[in-house]
Design a protein with these regions (language model features):
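C-terminal motif of bacterial Sec signal peptides marking the signal peptidase cleavage site
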Residues: 17-20
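Mature extracytoplasmic/periplasmic domains
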Residues: 298-359
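Early extracytoplasmic/lumenal segment of secretory-pathway proteins
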Residues: 35-124
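Short beta-strand->loop
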Residues: 132-143, 161, 277-289, 298-301
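A structural signal for short loop-to-beta-strand junctions that line the ligand-binding cleft
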Residues: 47-50, 106, 110-119, 132-171, ...
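Periplasmic solute-binding protein
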Residues: 77, 119-132, 149-150, 154-183, ...
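Conserved C-terminal helix/tail region of periplasmic/extracytoplasmic solute-binding proteins
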Residues: 355-422
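Ligand-binding pocket segment of bilobal, Venus flytrap-like solute-binding proteins
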Residues: 200-204, 208, 212, 220-284
């Protein structure tokens, strides 16, 4: 939605300029393209020349589809622009969940210089010394981060992270097959048997448990064993209804109409609405998770100063806007927010009002080791419940098939014997 608005505005500006010219023939195709294209201006170009010619490279580990790649005409390729400006090569790879990121770093099998985990995972990594303090002298563009995103609970002294995006979780659905009025849609639709095998569910424990906890009236940060078990039972109850537990696949399946209903992050939902006009997105009134993803440097990083330069680059106003315009998530960056059109700034999905945030949202905190362990065990139990269901049905079906085969053989022999007699 935002990308389409941006391009339309650029096109209108180009047309207006063309109409104002007495001789439109002097406008070349290159000039028209320049009018439509996003441009990059940095505040201190000399700052970015410190490592030129040194052959440095940084390893960046980020969520999929979470940076402007220049794939859309007229948009910036953020990593390519950084490489061109600094001479530092960016090795860029993706992960699908916070848990995947954590496992990769904890296992020590790879070295990364920049990561972008979510709030609760940042808190966990700080506790386990997996991320290191930042030198904010190397990140002057931190000045653009809005005050209400500084010193968050997951990084109280703001030593380890720079906010990148934020958003809420809601429900995306196909309006051509879901016949429930939008204002009545809530999390219980993910348990609605009318949509058997057409529902997708998150394939990570924290997000999935959160939805069950909201339905049961619990805090998203509960550590009570009875409540965690009740949430797990709720997810097990859902197993026979859902088509599958997925993450990135939600985008393709919903866009193609291969599923009808799924929980989804608001930014990704706004992007997918561009591809399928039948889809709708709603943030349930019963409550939701508000998440913040922030940029950190792991303790294993080999190029800390170059990584801080990359973080500062992501906070350049033109870059911050290009990213937000492309991925459609909400921004904590004051200059990027001012560059958005008024419609987007007032969009209740992208920027819900303060009352909704205060009363209907909850930010994840890092749970205790004991609670994390119990949730993971319950999650594993829930996931294995699918196999148990298969086994429970497989045995009777196999038995019936076996009996039928035996009866068939006996009938065949009986008929054959009768033929032999006559």
């Amino acid at each position: 939605m935002k990308r389409r608005i941006y391009k339309a505005a650029a096109l209108l500006a180009a047309l207006a300029l063309l109409c104002s010219c007495n001789n439109s023939e002097i406008e070349t195709e290159e000039e028209e393209e320049e009018l439509e294209a996003q441009t990059l201006t940095v505040e201190d170009e000399e700052y970015y020349t410190r490592f030129k010619g040194q052959g440095l490279s940084i390893n960046v580990y980020n969520w999929g589809e979470y940076i402007c790649t220049g794939a859309d005409e007229g948009t910036l390729n953020v990593n390519a622009e950084f490489e061109k400006l600094t001479g530092i090569k960016v090795n860029y790879t993706n992960y699908a969940t916070n848990e995947e990121l954590y496992a990769k770093l904890k296992g020590g099998g790879a070295t990364y210089d920049v990561i972008i985990p979510s709030d609760y995972m940042i808190s966990k990594m700080i506790k386990e010394d997996m991320v290191q303090p930042l030198n904010f002298d190397n990140i002057p563009n931190f000045k653009y981060i809005m005050d209400n995103f500084r010193n968050p609970d997951y990084d109280k002294e703001n030593l380890y992270s720079v906010p990148y995006t934020w958003g809420t979780v809601g429900i995306i659905y196909d309006s051509t097959v879901v016949d429930i009025p939008e204002e009545e849609i809530d999390w219980d639709i993910l348990w609605n048997e009318d949509y058997l095998d057409q529902i997708l569910m998150f394939d990570n424990p924290r997000d999935a448990f959160a939805i069950a906890e909201i339905m049961l009236g619990y805090s998203l940060n509960t550590e009570d064993s009875e409540e965690l078990n009740a949430a797990a039972d709720k997810l097990i109850e859902q197993k026979r209804i859902v088509q599958g537990h997925v993450m990135d696949e939600i985008f393709d399946k919903m866009a193609a109409g291969d599923a009808w209903i799924a929980p989804y992050y608001a930014g990704d939902a706004l992007t997918i609405l561009e591809q399928n006009e039948d889809l709708r997105f709603v943030v349930p009134e019963s409550g939701t998770n508000l998440f913040i993803d922030a940029i950190c440097i792991p303790t294993c990083a080999k190029q800390k100063e170059a990584a801080e330069m990359y973080i500062n680059f992501l906070c350049e106003p033109d870059i911050a806007f290009a990213n937000i315009d492309y991925i459609c998530y909400s921004t904590p960056h004051s200059a990027a927010f001012e560059m958005l059109d008024e419609e987007t700034q007032q969009d209740p999905v992208s920027y819900p009002d303060e009352e909704f945030i205060a009363e209907k949202t909850e930010i994840f905190v890092n749970l205790s080791d004991e609670a994390n362990r119990e949730m993971q065990e319950l999650w594993t139990k829930m996931k294995s419940a699918e196999d148990e269901n298969v086994n429970r049905w497989f045995a009777p079906v196999f038995l019936v098939a076996g009996i039928a085969a035996i009866i068939g053989i006996l009938i065949y022999r009986y008929i054959k014997n009768k033929k032999d007699i006559f």
